[in-house]
Amino acid sequence: MWPPSGAVRNLALVLARSQRARTCSGVERVSYTQGQSPEPRTREYFYYVDHQGQLFLDDSKMKNFITCFKDLQFLVTFFSRLRPNHSGRYEASFPFLSLCGRERNFLRCEDRPVVFTHLLASDSESPRLSYCGGGEALAIPFEPARLLPLAANGRLYHPAPERAGGVGLVRSALAFELSACFEYGPSSPTVPSHVHWQGRRIALTMDLAPLLPAAPPP
């Protein structure tokens, strides 16, 4: 079972839709019941992460700061075990899966499964980007040269753990702060060519672009 988050999830289940099988949006229409047991001693749960990096039960009627998961230990466990869903179940509608023993936790996302929410500064080491409410426990080195501003949807992306898709979305508030560091060339007024960071002028590599073939709507 998950770390002492049972009470957290139980509360979220109360706030979610009834436990009857329902249809959710996705590439295909699929029915499920939260906590269903397709096999003995196996449970399945279904989650959703929005563009702010907030995690919800997928069938929550209302998705806002009140209803999102906030338990740090739960979030760290959930996202540190996130992998592409190759289980043969719900792969099209829930492309990511977080396993905990015999518990399957399926995830779909508004944009990307990893959403960077905070830039953690430190006097002794390079800054790190924290994602999905995990603080220091869910953080990776900040690579300013690999920031990817996408003109198609006005969003900003950064490398993410490979197991979680390799590309993460930068939350809008943080993206706005970082945008002040961008330099735009005369030939490309909508897409920056360089970023100014810690006294350096750094060319943007744009190497993440091939990993985002279809930009989600703004």
From Swiss-Prot:
Which cellular components does GO assign to this protein? mitochondrion
Q: Which Pfam families match?
A: DUF4505
Q: Which domain of life is it from?
A: Eukaryota
* Family per record: Belongs to the UPF0598 family.
User: What is the name attached to this protein's record?
Assistant: UPF0598 protein C8orf82 homolog
